[in-house]
A protein has these predicted regions:
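A membrane-topology feature that recognizes alpha-helical transmembrane segments
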Residues: 1-299
């Protein structure tokens, strides 16, 4: 019963984090459009008209508002999931559609946080684990930049560099905490393992990005891969699994894209690879205990 109530609380936290992440996505996009406009690049005038209000005020005075009519949202308009459902996905004032991104993100983050809590619960038969709670909280916070990157790359095929490095820092802290709780702590073997893992995934993608001039792999993908490796168990086999699963998920994305657009998959098709890498990491993260047992059995 205690785990159930806590999972609901963390699920609600996930919905809040999801709502915050989507808000940052629109702010980052508005800033990008402003920078491109200032540098003389051609931008989408309709999109800029919709988002420019997000960069026209100082961060201190920035308040959540409708991007269509400017209505400043009240606290009861900002309750994740519930507000969207009660308003039918529309602005309270002008009734323009808010869009499904906000709702889907909040629901997905609610479900994800519940699952992650159940997998990494700091509560066990042995009692409460402060280490487990610390690791869990860092992981939850790391999901904010991950969510931002997932949405941003899916919409505009671009990974914001600053957000990547924020995530990488959080992932590194998560890795440090994980090792601080192990019996052996830091040793040459653990350093060797992480070095091999970095060679198997991030370094391979770095080389591919440089050789292809970022045609095969984006410049942000290999940087993101560094942080994703830190989230997984410190075994090179997980880097190999992540490399395989990321490409497999990317292929699935390409198939769905071709089906939705009624087009055949062509050689050289470009798909946002960040979401594929993130989704692959989540799958490995959730099933890591099973995979650890399985790999120890076959190796």
């Amino acid at each position: 019963m205690e785990n159930f109530l806590l999972s609901l609380c963390f699920g609600a936290l996930g919905a809040v984090f999801g709502s915050f992440a989507v808000a940052q996505v629109w702010r980052l996009r508005a800033k990008q459009l402003q920078d491109e406009k200032t540098s003389g690049e051609k931008i989408d005038a309709t999109e800029w008209k919709k988002l420019r209000s997000l960069v026209s005020v100082s961060p201190k005075n920035d308040r959540s508002h409708c991007l269509n009519c400017g209505y400043q949202l009240k606290w009861y308009d900002l309750i994740p999931v519930i507000s969207w459902l009660s308003l039918g996905g529309k602005c309270r004032k002008c009734h323009s559609k808010i869009g499904a991104t906000e709702f889907l993100t909040e629901v997905s983050m609610f479900a994800l946080f519940v699952i992650i809590f159940l997998v990494f619960s700091p509560l066990s038969s042995a009692g409460f684990s402060l280490f487990g709670l610390s690791r869990l909280l860092i992981l939850f916070v790391a999901f904010i930049p991950l969510t931002i990157m997932f949405i941003y790359d899916a919409k505009w095929s671009l990974l914001p560099t600053k957000v990547i490095w924020i995530f990488n820092f959080l992932a590194f802290i998560y890795w440090i905490i994980a090792f601080a709780n192990t019996t052996n702590g830091f040793n040459l073997f653990s350093v060797f393992n992480i070095a091999i893992s970095m060679t198997l995934f991030p370094l391979v993608y770095f080389v591919l990005a440089k050789i292809s001039k970022e045609e095969w792999v984006g410049g942000g993908d290999w940087i993101l891969a560094i942080g994703l490796i830190f989230l997984l168990p410190n075994q090179p086999i997980f880097a190999m699994l992540l490399l395989f699963l990321s490409n497999f998920v990317g292929l699935i994305f390409a198939l769905f894209q071709s089906i939705l657009q009624f087009k055949k998959i062509k050689r050289g098709i470009r798909i946002p690879f960040g979401p594929a890498m993130i989704l692959a990491t989540l799958i490995l993260l959730i099933f890591q205990q099973f995979l650890l047992v399985f790999t120890s059995f076959i190796m």
